[in-house]
């Protein structure tokens, strides 16, 4: 008989899953000691924007979006390689356990096997409506002096014209340690602000800010991250994404400018959009719940 999940809804549609990892301290130790040079599978740590470092790709010589079925087939020849393989499998399997429960409890219209009609990828293969991505394993710098390590944002990428493709819908963050100061995640939704300090082994699932899913009344969910001190914060980021057909205006502009030219124009268009619609850097106007 399967044991019931230890899950806490800390705020509407924000769930914390606890106790999923067999030995979170060992997982943390393996990640912390990994330099990408030993006889393991993990790649070296490389720069992650201005926030810190991440392991990219996860495994040496493999792409950065390994599915469970791919990881299960990875051959290992050393004890360290097998340990790294099991770490990744546990992260992936726990993601599935938590997010499938979250999807059911929040009545998300979800079919993992549904195919997008009349659309193929660049190789002519069918496209699934829902795809998961990750994990991206990262660690935050300890010398960020700004009030926020990451400003309030949605993982869903805001666009002036919706492009065709998969969009972030559900975010799942796994936390491997809590031996640091700070590092809280702060949510803004529907005029409320709610701050949570993750504990080692927590798997936090919440809306990515997609305007068609998991709203708080008429409000999307924003989240920001506080800086850490003394020790880095180690975490994994994973997502469920849902395919969008794209706005009619997108295809009208493809016809007008040509596909290649219209694609080349996106960098400047997106920069202008971000400059005119910056992320928030405080929650001063919200009602503080916690």
Identify the role of each PLM range.
Residues 27-33, 92-95, 169-179, 237-240, ...:
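Short, Φ-rich (hydrophobic/aromatic) sequence segments
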Residues 149-157:
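Histidine-centered catalytic micro-motifs
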Residues 166-168, 181-290:
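Catalytic core of Fe(II)/2-oxoglutarate
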Residues 2-123, 127-129, 136, 143, ...:
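Non-heme Fe(II)/2-oxoglutarate
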Residues 19-20, 138-140, 155, 175, ...:
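Structured loops at beta-to-helix junctions and adjacent beta-edge loops in soluble globular domains
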Residues 135, 148-149:
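Metzincin-family zinc-dependent endopeptidase catalytic domain
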Residues 139-142, 160-181:
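Short, conserved beta-strand element in jelly-roll/cupin
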Residues 4-6, 124-127, 161-164, 176, ...:
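Beta-strand elements of modular eukaryotic interaction domains
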């Amino acid at each position: 008989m399967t044991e019931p999940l230890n899950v806490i809804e800390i705020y509407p549609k924000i769930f914390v899953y606890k106790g999923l990892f067999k030995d979170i301290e060992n997982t943390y130790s393996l990640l912390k000691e990994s330099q990408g040079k030993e006889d393991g599978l993990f790649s070296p740590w490389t720069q992650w924007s201005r926030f810190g470092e991440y392991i990219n790709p996860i495994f040496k010589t493999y792409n950065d979006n390994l599915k469970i079925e791919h990881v299960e087939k990875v051959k290992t020849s050393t004890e360290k390689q097998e340990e790294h393989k099991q770490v990744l499998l546990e992260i992936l399997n726990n993601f599935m356990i938590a997010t499938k429960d979250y999807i059911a409890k929040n009545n998300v219209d979800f079919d993992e096997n549904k195919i997008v009609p009349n659309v193929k990828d660049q190789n002519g293969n069918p496209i699934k409506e829902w795809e998961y991505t990750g994990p991206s394993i990262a660690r935050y710098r300890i010398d960020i002096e700004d009030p926020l390590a990451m400003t309030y944002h949605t993982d869903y990428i805001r666009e002036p014209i919706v492009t065709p493709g998969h969009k972030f819908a559900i975010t799942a963050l796994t936390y491997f340690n809590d031996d640091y100061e700070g590092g809280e995640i702060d949510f803004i939704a529907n005029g409320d602000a709610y701050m949570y300090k993750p504990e080692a082994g927590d798997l936090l699932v919440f809306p990515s800010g997609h305007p068609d899913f998991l709203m708080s009344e008429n409000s999307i969910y924003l989240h920001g991250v506080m800086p850490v001190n003394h020790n880095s914060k180690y975490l994994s980021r994973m997502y469920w994404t849902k395919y969008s057909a794209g706005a009619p205006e997108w295809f009208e502009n493809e016809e007008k400018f040509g596909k290649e030219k219209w694609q080349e124009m996106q960098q400047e268009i997106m920069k202008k959009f971000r400059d005119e619609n910056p992320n928030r850097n405080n929650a001063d106007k919200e009602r503080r719940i916690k």
